[in-house]
Structures are given as structure tokens and as C-alpha cells.
Amino acid sequence: NQQQLDIKAEIDDFMEKVFPNEELREYMWDHAASTLIGENINQKFIIYTGVGGNGKSIWVDLINLMLGDYADKINIALLTQKRKSIGGPTPEIAKLKGRRFVSMDEPSAGDELNEGIMKQMTGGDEMEGRAMYAKKMLKFVPQFELTCCTNHLFTIKSTDKGTWRRIRQVDFRAEFVDPEDYEIKKAQGLVGDKDRPIYVKDLKLKDKLPSWVEVFTAILIERVNETGGIVRDCPMVLEASKRYEEKENFWRQFINENIVKGTPDDKIKKNDIRNHFNEWYQTNYQQKPPKSSELYEQLEKNIGKQRNRAWYGYRIVYEAYDSEEEDGSD
């Protein structure tokens, strides 16, 4: 009927504004549709990023309204704390049985992701939790899409592929502002960027969401019948996720910034690279550096096997003030 068509037009308008990139928009439709199948086949942890009023919270509210009791929210501490002692009550895990969409609010700057718990929550293996005062542990296979809304990304120290293949960063690039701010930004020439559009905020949008639920659900049912719940990656999400990984992976950062291919006669001695790495790490992280054995393992993974306590065909990039040391390092 006409009312449903009008609501569909409103939803389409919302999606086009919040996700101006068409490939990303399709990705997010598929992501929302996947919550309906009751099986976590994608095994992803999707992190919604973006500063200010960009539609993140409205998007989460809409999915929560659609799913009702099948959606839940958890405390960020569940993913940032160390594992609890075995046998203690874990009601925050027990309550996730049967959920289809689980969201959390942002970590504080510098909060470190507990990769083990994240893998448990996004994997296809059994989890177990015990409700408060319950005698028995509750075992279940996670069925939910795990998401987080944040301006601050987690610190992730893991370099293993099992962690990073699960993480997807979705940038919310639109901005919704008050009318007076819109006019200011317009005068500054900031309005009109298709990649990062700016719109006047709809102050009644949140009130419209309950009336959208029926049509939104119908769209997703039609969608999931086509996709089977599979969410195919899109370039924008993969690029953002790769940038995140490279920033977090200090090993890769160190190698990219400090080691370059040279002539066959060039070589990097183990002692030289260890000293250079220790200085670089302490400068950047103000902490005790990892063991030398970890450094050598990462170098073998990334630039190849050593021979005679050196890596041949590569050289260390020193800062300008270190150039004299470089000349005399051998």
C-alpha cells in the first residue's frame, strides 16, 4: 500500500545518506539481513567508526527495534578484560544465548582487545557461561553478529591471521548537523563532498524508527533469501580494515618503515637490527621491547630466512642524523 511505499522511500533515503558509497550500502544491507538466519556463518567482528552525528546509533537502534529480544548489548569490558577465573559466574556471556545481534559502546582510547574472547564470540564453537546463582554452566554456539560503535579503535597486539580475518571496520562518513551548523559549513564550502556528505539533522528521525520496523524487516527477509546470510566483502571495508591492521601491527610498521630491499651485497646483521628495533620500540611505545627471538621470527616471516646471522639483500633505513652510524655499522 501507499503508506508502506512511503516508508520504504524513507528507509532508502536514510540508507543512501548514511552510506553514500553504493558498495558499502549493499554490504550493510547484507550485514543486517544476516542477523535473521540464526547462524554466525560470516564469523566477523564489525566495528562501526566515525566521529560525531553520523548515523551509527540510529542504525543500531533500527536493528535492535527490528530484532527485539533477539538483540542485546554488552559491556565493552567483556572484550577488553582478561579471562575470568574458571567456574565463576559469567552472566554477561550466558545472556547471549540465542541472540542474533550484539552491540557495545566504544572502548576508551588505548583499551586492548582480548582476541581470545573475540574469537570465541565470532567463531562457530561452543561458548559457555553461567548465570548468577545458577548451578550449571550454559553451553551454546553463538548465533549473533558482534558489533561495536566507536570513535576510538581497540589496541590489537595480535599479528595472527585468525584475529585479523575476523575484523571489519566500517567507516560512517556522512555527517548530520543542526541547521545553523549546516549553513556555516556550506559557507565554508564543505557541503557537497560526495565521499563525506553533510546533511541537516532530522530531529524527528528517531521517532520514525518504530514505524519503519515492519517494512525494514520485509526488505531484509527478501534480501536474506537471496544471500543465504552471506556477507560479501566490499573494497571500502577491506581497505579500512587493512589500514587498521597495518597501524596496529607494530611489527609490520617497523619493517615497512625501517627495512628496504638493497643490493645482493647489502645485509642486515642480527645485532644491528636488534639494537635498532629496541631503540625504535622504546621511542614509540615507552615500554620494554619484545624478546629478540620474536623480532627474528617476524623478520623471517616477512623478509625471509637469515644465514650466517644476517639477512642478505636488505638494509636498515636510518634517520638522517644516524647516517654516519649507518656508514660504520658494518
Task: Mark where each language-model region is.
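Signature of the SF2 helicase/ATPase Hel1-core->accessory helical subdomain module
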Residues: K119-G123, Q169
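P-loop NTPase catalytic core of nucleic-acid-dependent motor ATPases
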Residues: N1-G98, R168-V170, F216, L220-N225, ...
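Positively charged interface segments
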Residues: D61, L65-P91, D111-E115, G129-K136, ...
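Loop/turn-to-beta-strand initiation segments
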Residues: G98-F101, E126, P142-L146
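Walker B catalytic acidic pair
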Residues: E106
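Short coil/turn segments at secondary-structure boundaries
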Residues: E26-H31, K44-I47, A131-K135, A218-L220, ...
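A eukaryotic nuclear recognition-module signature that targets compact all-alpha binding cores
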Residues: K247-G262, N278
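Phosphate-handling catalytic cores of nucleic-acid transaction enzymes
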Residues: L209-N249
